[in-house]
Amino acid sequence: MSVIHTNEKIQPQSLDSWDQRKITIVSDAWHPQVNGVVRTVEATAVALRELDHQVQILNPSEFLTVPCPMYPEIRLSLDVWPRVGKLLEEFCPDSILIATEGPLGIAARNYCISKGLKFTTNFNTKFPEYIRLRVPIPERWSYKYFQWFHNPSESVLVPTESLATYLHERGIKNTGWWSRGVDIDLFRPYDESILQDLPRPISLYVGRISVEKNVNAFLDLDIPGTKVLVGNGPAMDKLKSDYPEAIFVGEKHGQELAQYYSAGDVLVFPSTTDTFGLVLLEALACGTPVAAYPVCGPVDVIKDNHVGILDNDLQKAVIAAIGLSSDDCRNYASNFSWRNCAASLLSNLSNNRSVWN
């Protein structure tokens, strides 16, 4: 994998010079899920269309679905064969991105292999680690499946260099780079604080409230002020009972979510299993510094200690991050755009145009 920093800007003229393409993105993750995969696919598709590319998104809303046993909000598509192949044949995409490893992803992968079509995959979630937290299955067993799934692709796209290294060590080697972005017009500092009546400083958590996000590490911190959690998930009821002093506000979206980011004095990111963490960019764009562990994701995003603090002692990181410059955070986040994200994707997609002709 060639090293490209995630905040490297891509010149507009290089975008405009590319041929118009028909691109299919296959994603088992879709609304009503609220996660980085859905936001990345959706925002990238918008940016690609703004560049005059045609984008088809194959997602569970077009299929019969059942809830995933461990994640009921994730819908697993049932009637994928032969419908996925027929939908691809109707659209005749120049490039195919398989964004997830679920039933839709498997159907698209197998169809491409059977027809000799080149395809690109995306690794966005450390499901082997998530599975290990719930059932006693060794990660190496789960990674055998991911090797099978990803290794036939032309390239396995990852958002960071550290994730590429992580996957190389687990037998997935053909990695490429697909960056991430943030809407700096939506995520920006807001004048009025919706949390103005709470004791300061306000330490903010934004994300899924579940075991794999390590939320307890945040709630157990002995820090001054107020802890506010934005999000929902299977661990929410228990954590609300165990930590009555914390404020749980549920899921927030759009401008209201941005106002919560802006109201915080620090975003605390306790996860050690994420592959990137879009919430890091969203908080920084709102002028809120970050405190996190020095792990995959944060070490790639928070390259400048003027915008966040990484420490194995999360309490030290939180205390040190409070008071960092909001302007520095905002300026740093402005380097990450969805237009650049679309550009990095385009540079890694294979061309099947001759196959359909």
Model-derived segments and spans:
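Nucleotide-sugar donor phosphate/pyrophosphate-binding loop at the beta->alpha transition
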Residues: 118-120, 129-148, 158
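Donor nucleotide-sugar binding/catalytic pocket of nucleotide-sugar-dependent glycosyltransferases
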Residues: 144-190
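Short alpha-helical donor nucleotide-sugar binding micro-motif in glycosyltransferases
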Residues: 150, 251, 259-264, 345
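Conserved donor-binding/catalytic core segment of Leloir-type glycosyltransferases
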Residues: 195-230
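Nucleotide-activated donor-binding/catalytic signature segment of Leloir-type glycosyltransferases, i.e.
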Residues: 237-255
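Aromatic "clamp/platform" in nucleotide-sugar-dependent glycosyltransferases that forms part
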Residues: 272
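Short hydrophobic beta-strand element within catalytic cores of glycosyltransferases
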Residues: 289-292
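A charged, aromatic-enriched C-terminal amphipathic alpha-helix characteristic of glycosyltransferases
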Residues: 323-357
